[in-house]
Amino acid sequence: MAAAEQVENWLSSRGFRTFPFHDGRVRYVALPAMPPTSVAANAYFFSIDSDLVYWNFFLDFGPLNLGQLYRFCAKLNAALASPKLRGRTIYFYSGTHPHRRTNAAALLSSWAIIFLNQTPEEAYAPFRGATPGFTPFHDATPIACSYNLTVYDCLCGLYKAKNLKFFDFDTFNVDEYEHYEQVENGDLNWHQEGKWLAFAGPHENSEMTRDGYQTLTVDDYGPYFQQKGVTLVVRLNKKYYDERKFLKYGIRVLDLYYLDGSNPPRAILDQFLREVEGNAGGIAVHCKAGLGRTGTCIGCYLMKHFKFTAAEVIGWFRICRPGTIIGPQQHYMAEMEQVMWREGDLYRQRKANEDKEEARPGDKEVVEGMLGSLETLALGAKATAPEAKRSKRHSAKQAADVESSTAAEEAAEEEGKMTQGDELRAMRARNMHGGGGGGMGIRRK
């Protein structure tokens, strides 16, 4: 009997089902412990359960982040390329806990998408019909989650991001990723390399907050942003720093504050989309923790311009930056999906029409164009007054909303209450340096 068959017989006789990948050269199995040496010697078994650890905020347990996915893929690829393991089946195994199984399935299927160039359907096919099924991922809250984000959702988001070249593991700098995700180094992650960056909000001074979070200043971020081509910072939270300090780095700041933990009012989302659509450089977005409001606004842009589904956005963003998009924001994304798709179609149609009109007109068209312009100016003069009034009313309402939201947040702070952003920052600080033990990156032995 061949060695591979002996291992399979041993596993199946004990009720352990294996899931084949790469024509059976790679298999996944959930095991309570490593098989005995007499069995394991006939194959190659490896696990990442104790090496790649997801440090949760609350009840969330995955998916593992982009740096951890990279390290998993590197480990598996090294085993496949090893001359010592030629001809031997490679078993990737995890513990039997539902969270372990779900994260393992996400890792291996993601590897198949990235390195076998498979579609989400192909990459997830070996796991179809797995019993028990895989537990949906939970958002970064301490209460029951009413939005089911599946392994397959994450795969679809990863697949779309890969095809759009939002990341490239051939050039991915895992050390840089793990460095800048640390609180003291920036607490930042790229959702689209070179274009969209999410980070925790800077403060006027660098200090340790009452919740144990190390704040950073504009000067901590400025040089890195300048190096990476960031030209716009969007601030979605209350003002904690002088935005003029970003100017010396060639970066302007757009203020679009709304209440922590909530969904963007339509006027704010519209202004966000208009501003970023006209920005040529990289865009860094922050709220308090850089997770909820930040992910929601960037996600709407991706739905509008790249036709991501809401689930694809959430899945991809949580791989990039764990904990992104929280609670009601998940359902808001689902509600905005079709809206953003329609607006994206109209945007692209309008741009296409504008491109056609840029062709130089003939003499007749020039004259007609001049006459039309004069008519437009005349009509515009009549319409200026009421239009200005509407704009003024809109600005006044937005200012009143900001003032109301700021007052509510300041009142909560005075009472010693923590907002969603405060709680997330506190848990992140704990994970990086305290009770969690090893951060969201690699825990090395």
Features from the language model and the residues they span:
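Cysteine-based protein phosphatase catalytic domain of the PTP/DSP
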Residues: A2-W111, L116-I283, C300-Q338, R342
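Polar/charged alpha-helical tracts
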Residues: N9, S13, A125, V230, ...
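Short cysteine clusters
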Residues: C287
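Conserved G/P- and acidic residue-centered "switch" motifs that form tight phosphate/ATP-binding loops
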Residues: G290
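Ser/Thr-glycine-rich phosphate-binding loops at phosphate-binding pockets of nucleotides
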Residues: T294
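Intrinsically disordered, low-complexity regulatory segments enriched in Ser/Pro/Gln/Gly
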Residues: Q338-V366
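Long, low-complexity intrinsically disordered regions
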Residues: R360-K445
